Amino acid sequence: MVKQVCETRTLIETYALEKMMQEEEEVFQQKLDVIKRYSDKCEEYYRQEKSVELALADLELHKAIVEGANNEILNDVYVGIQGRFIVVNYLIRPLKNRNYEGTVQDHFEILKFIEDRDTKKAVDKLRNHIQGTIKRFCEDE
């Protein structure tokens, strides 16, 4: 189940990011600002060791990426996938037992590639970031 959820998230989020990267500059910058805001919150909560708040900001960051595609059907599908992810991820792996340093660093790198409008690197890093969840689950089992 974890693998299927992560694979589906990867498909949706990378597609959405590719669509967002094709936007005209003004629209692109507005969407980028939203993603930056959540990335900054993740970093702030990481420094404050607020794992619940960080996890919520992380979910919002990924949702903002999907919303960047301007596709309501995709958003609706993603809400269901994100719900399944919450169940398999947060019930199986307690928040307080996690190391979020890699998550925050990944967000920083993804954001840099988005800012540079390097679609390939941004999508590849996002894909690796989500797929890292599968590896972390395997380590915990």
Predicted regions mapped to residue ranges:
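Amphipathic alpha-helical dimerization/coiled-coil segments
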Residues: I12-E44
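Residue-level recognition of alpha-helical structural elements
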Residues: M1, E24-K31, R47-L54, N70, ...
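Hydrophobic packing residues in well-ordered alpha-helices of helical domains and bundles
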Residues: V5, K31-I35, L54, D58, ...
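C-terminal all-alpha effector/ligand-binding and dimerization domain
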Residues: K36-E43, Q48, G83-E141
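Hydrophobic, amphipathic alpha-helical faces that serve as interaction scaffolds
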Residues: M1-E24, L59-N97, T133
